[in-house]
Amino acid sequence: HAGVTLLTLRETCGDRLPCGTIIDTPRFGYRGQHLDCARHFFGIDFILRLLDLMALLKLNRFHWHFADDEAFRLEVDTHPLLWQRTAFRGEGELVPGVFGGGIRAGGSYSKADVARVVAHAKALQIEVLPEIEVPAHSHAMIKAVPGLRDPGDNGEEASVQGYIDNIVNPAVPATWDLLVPLAKEVAGLFPIGILHLGADEAPHGAWGGSPAVAALKAREGLQTSDDVQGWMLAKLAGALGAAGVRVAAWEEASKGVQGGIGNAALLFSWTGQGPGVEAARRGHDVVMCPAQNAYFDLAHSPDPDDWGAAWAGFVPLEKTVAWDPVPQGAEDIAPRISGVEACFWGEFTTEDGQAEGMIAPRILGIATKGWEPAGRTDGAALRSLASVYGPLYDRIGWRRYRGA
């Protein structure tokens, strides 16, 4: 980090640096960038370049999202059908392309790939956080491994993305036969000692038509779908905890009877900061990643020529610093805020360069929120700072957004 500071000073001041003493320390211990490699397959070279970019901005956590409805891309030994059947999408594949795309595309990550990413990250003082997605966002998993749903379930609950079969059933034995060995194997590949379980966006009314879940509810005293998900996550967290692995999850994991997944879990607050504040007050450590400020799949502006989504608004550069990870009035939970994260989701990505321009220069704003004291850099100052970093992006060959 000291070397990066000197590097950026050289960009600002040239080869002659002013004399002085630098006293600098990060505000938060967790400063992350997430990458969705399930919807769009990013090759290892891209990931290594992203790690280089993160290091230039003193980010220290890479959140690797390689499993979702569309694919499971990690080459695991416990259940090889997961990646063998879903790593590629398109005509003739088990999982078709989105929006009618028929051209075969995709890929998977070998254990050698994982080791390469972990080693490169370690050299840059970055840890890699892996994520599997359960119980929802599991369409690919369900397609690849039969038996993860109750055959007597007559429900057709749909996910936000339109899938009617994307949630595994915690009341059937096959689910546990798959999940516990899978989770332990994945966690064992990454030195961080934490496994992100997903747990977001369970379809409304999930498992409502499942006789097996009805019996589970009666046996365990559960009432709602949130109760069932929470029970499932707590059970999986217990199995991982016994193996020395801490769990993380999206904010929804704390819903349900007895607090869902349990207070030891690290939660990621993505729909806004409110759920994160509530979770922190219940005893969770929280990473703030509100979509309105930190989701880089959202367009930079309303300009119709700007690529990106708009479901949570638009995120111009200035908006990435127009918030505080510890909201005003919630200073009591400051010790529970572990840090911040920017997220890039790949539903609409067709080529890597799109992601580059969505991530940079906005990644600088989230890095700033994670490092600096509250309120130091506003939008105007950030835009000025971004111009300093431009040549550094160019030097590592990272394309950046050049619009307004």
Predicted segment positions?
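Glycine-centered loop/turn motif at secondary-structure junctions
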Residues: 58, 123-125, 244, 283, ...
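Acidic, contiguous N-terminal accessory segments
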Residues: 1-31, 241, 246-254, 261, ...
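Flexible, acidic glycine-rich loops studded with aromatic residues
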Residues: 247-255, 259-265, 269-404
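Feature activates predominantly on carbohydrate-active enzymes
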Residues: 1-176, 184-194, 235, 239, ...
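Hydrophobic alpha-helix position signal
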Residues: 54, 121, 217, 240, ...
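Active-site neighborhood of glycoside hydrolase catalytic domains
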Residues: 141-151, 156-265, 270-283
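Generic recognition of stable, solvent-exposed alpha-helical segments in well-folded globular domains
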Residues: 46-49, 109-116, 174-182, 227-235, ...
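Flexible loop/turn segments at secondary-structure boundaries
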Residues: 41-43, 69-75, 135-141, 196, ...
